[in-house]
């Protein structure tokens, strides 16, 4: 078996990631949803999530061992999925399984999407709301629900004289962060990890953080999409970004070169209290060889000074919808449908997605996730706190995100102004939406 990574997070490596078996194996008898071994096709999955590459390789290898069906998993570099997908789909041996981020992504790829209406995997969904539709056709299946917020080192926070209960609003967060900065040399740590703006990290701010002003504008206007964002809460976006970059492990001018690995390693080394990231980071922080246990960490909402902050939850949703390439051969389509059904219905698949990938999956056979951050989200929801919806799937294009990211980077470096960020956000949105409408 050949296992590898096309390009990992922040990497420029280029090698095939494949899981194949030399001979056909019998299907396991241990589960009623065991995979079949007589499929004639093959599976090529273009994976979106670098942090789960190893787990997908292992699961693909297990499926191949069990069924004899070749499964190739290729993982795009962080921030390069759309570019990689365009390149791979132009090849004769194109992915049989790929993903889109929601309605905007689907608009670009719907002509390649097999109608999953009535498929076995669609029948496993716990709610039809996780089916991505175009008219009556189901063209995508949401396969993971995730949360993001401020991952917090409770031990460091307590060393600074505070607890999680002291932070219930942006004003509270600002007070704590600025106090930590004032005593940074004495304490030996910063408030925030570096807000890296290179391609392996900038999505945290041009997409995930940018979701907050979009969400609150949509809430205020009673909408769920727009061709003309107004930027009502961009002052709040500025406030939280300023807090990040002025109370972190490095000078703001250094952020253009800071990576996702830099930010994670700073947190792992207890150099900062807060780390904006998501539930997908759990296995990078807790477990064998990692410095933290569940008792050391939690996740807090990203407060920006808008709305009922005392009852605000984590940012929870999905931008991960599986699509099956309808241009693939019938055998490959059937093999791909069998594979994804096995992933979400078999003991092996659901356990791997819960334990190894840290996923909460919206399927009937889902295993309970041991992920601390998933549990925190569940607890907040049970307490009546309102999750912040993932509205960034309505962002008009990747080009829009890149424009906002470039403006944020220049602003942090002191070579650009916040007005440039506003222009990229508001005018850029209108321009990209107009291009979409004309396409």
Positions of predicted regions on the chain:
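Glycine-centered hinge/linker elements that transmit conformational signals in sensory
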Residues: 177-178, 223-257
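Extracytoplasmic/periplasmic solute-binding protein
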Residues: 139-141, 148, 174-226, 272
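Conserved C-terminal helix/tail region of periplasmic/extracytoplasmic solute-binding proteins
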Residues: 158, 182, 348-350, 365-369, ...
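Extracytoplasmic/periplasmic substrate-recognition and gating elements
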Residues: 61, 66, 160, 249, ...
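Short, solvent-exposed loop/beta-turn-alpha elements that line the ligand-binding surface or hinge
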Residues: 115-129, 192, 196-199, 214-239, ...
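A structural signal for short loop-to-beta-strand junctions that line the ligand-binding cleft
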Residues: 88, 95-96, 122-157, 188-190, ...
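Hinge/lid segment of periplasmic solute-binding proteins
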Residues: 37, 101-151, 204, 208, ...
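Extracytoplasmic "Venus flytrap"/periplasmic binding protein-like
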Residues: 62-127, 139-140, 155-161, 168, ...
């Amino acid at each position: 078996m050949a296992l590898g990574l096309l390009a990992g997070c922040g990497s420029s490596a280029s090698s095939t990631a494949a899981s194949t078996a030399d001979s056909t194996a019998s299907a396991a008898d241990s589960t009623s949803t065991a995979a079949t071994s007589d499929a004639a096709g093959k599976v090529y999955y273009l994976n979106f999530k670098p942090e789960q590459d190893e787990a997908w390789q292992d699961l693909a290898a297990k499926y191949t061992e069990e069924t004899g069906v070749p499964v190739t998993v290729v993982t795009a570099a962080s921030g390069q999925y759309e570019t990689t997908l365009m390149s791979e789909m132009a090849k004769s041996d194109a992915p049989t399984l790929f993903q889109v981020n929601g309605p905007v992504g689907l608009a670009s790829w719907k002509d390649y999407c097999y109608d999953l209406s009535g498929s076995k995997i669609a029948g496993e969904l716990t709610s039809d709301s996780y089916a991505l539709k175009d008219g009556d056709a189901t063209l995508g299946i949401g396969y993971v629900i995730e949360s993001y917020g401020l991952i917090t080192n409770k031990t460091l926070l307590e060393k600074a004289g505070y607890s999680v209960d002291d932070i219930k609003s942006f004003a509270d967060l600002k007070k704590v962060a600025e106090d930590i900065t004032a005593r940074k040399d004495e304490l030996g740590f910063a408030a925030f990890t570096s807000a890296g703006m290179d391609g392996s990290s900038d999505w945290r701010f041009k997409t995930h953080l940018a979701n907050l002003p979009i969400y609150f504008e949509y809430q205020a206007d009673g909408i769920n999409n727009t061709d003309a964002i107004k930027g009502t809460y961009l002052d709040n976006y500025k406030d939280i970004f300023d807090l990040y970059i002025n109370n972190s492990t490095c000078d703001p001018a250094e952020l253009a070169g800071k990576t996702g690995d830099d930010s994670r390693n700073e947190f792992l080394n207890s150099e900062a209290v807060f780390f904006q990231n998501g539930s997908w980071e759990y296995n990078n922080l807790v477990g064998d060889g990692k410095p933290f246990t569940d008792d050391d960490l939690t996740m807090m909402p990203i407060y920006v000074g808008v709305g009922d902050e005392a009852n605000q939850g984590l940012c929870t949703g999905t931008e991960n919808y599986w699509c099956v390439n309808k241009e693939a051969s019938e055998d490959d389509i059937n093999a791909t449908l069998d594979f994804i059904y096995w992933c979400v219905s078999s003991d092996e698949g659901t356990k791997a997605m819960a334990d190894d990938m840290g996923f909460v999956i919206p399927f009937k056979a889902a295993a309970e996730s041991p992920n601390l951050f998933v549990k925190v989200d569940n607890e907040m929801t049970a307490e009546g706190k309102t999750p912040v919806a993932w509205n960034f799937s309505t962002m008009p294009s990747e080009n829009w995100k890149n424009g906002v990211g470039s403006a944020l980077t220049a602003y942090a470096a002191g070579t650009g102004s916040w007005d440039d960020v506003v222009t990229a956000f508001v005018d850029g949105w209108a321009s990209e939406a107009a291009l979409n409408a004309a396409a």
